[in-house]
From Swiss-Prot:
Cited function: Catalyzes the oxidative demethylation of N-methyl-L-tryptophan.
Name of this chain's protein: N-methyl-L-tryptophan oxidase
Residues that coordinate or bind FAD: 4-34
Name of the gene this protein is made from: solA
Transmembrane domains' residue ranges: none
Organism expressing this protein natively: Salmonella typhi
MF terms (GO), sorted A to Z: flavin adenine dinucleotide binding; N-methyl-L-amino-acid oxidase activity; sarcosine oxidase activity
Keyword set, alphabetical order: FAD, Flavoprotein, Oxidoreductase
Amino acid sequence: MKYDLIIIGSGSVGAAAGYYATRAGLKVLMTDAHMPPYQQGSHHGDTRLIRHAYGEGEKYVPLVLRAQTLWDELSTHNEEPIFVRSGVVNLGPADSAFLANVARSAQQWQLNVERLDATALMTRWPEIRVPDNYIGLFEADSGFLRSELAITTWLRLAREAGCAQLFNSPVSHIHHDDNGVTIETSEGCYHASKALISAGTWVKTLVPELPVQPVRKVFAWFKADGRYSTKNRFPAFTGEMPNGDHYYGFPAENDELKIGKHNGGQRIQAPEERKPFAAVASDGAEAFPFLRNVLPGIGGCLHGAACTYDNSPDEDFIIDTLPGHENTLVITGLSGHGFKFAPVLGEIAADFALGKTPSFDLTPFRLSRFSQ
């Protein structure tokens, strides 16, 4: 049997692509080396932020707004909502370049973002402490996503729509010819007109020339009471420290508040180098500088987890066909800020398989930018 689309890597983007391509009427085969959702990638740990006014650049805003529409639609397929509209407050020095980007994208796209000075910030959320020169940009329409629930939902919906799924079966080789794409797996060879490579952190095992660096990252849950929960209208947050370190976190659930540091981490070259949480001496204390200064009422570390970022050189996404192979789309280099975009990236992959022109300007995400 020849498929219209083979998906290599069915974590976040691949799971979404499998659903949207199958829903569009294509014959799709989803593959993965593991059984998604899983702990080996970048999507575990229960939750991920979604922000619309985007500090990483205005080029992402059209994508994330479309993603939000798709998240809202996906949430209707579950009793438990996938998207929680908690609001997100971005904290940092008034002269922060990141916050300037947030404000600029909000203005350009007419997004609902409220600017709070330090006094107003601490009045609204007395649990938060910031220096006098800090501001908060609060986006009430943003929030967080239940990442593993999302992937489980996409997989179920794709399967129910007739998508073939081959999991726990690593792809060892990809071959291109005039008839399309062939993959080799432990279960045999499979053929398709087109392929999506969304293999995440270890994409270079299949495409060694891609400029992607795996980075080991950690996040942890700390003791927190009801003041820090959505029931008390406590928001999700990002926070920039005076030294430039960036943190992110979520409202407490079940008296546990999750927080992580976005920058830093350990560069790794193989899956076995991604040691579990607490294997690196600094893991448990990584969030202390932020908690001690900004959220001093939070208690001790309860537990943590390790994940991996697939970092591109400029930490912007890679969305492009493989050089010399126009029938193979690669989506990688999501650099620790990609999960919120998973549905729109999956939709882009489905449109690619259908032969449709992308609805978005993907020029900033082409591979050619690294050779200029």
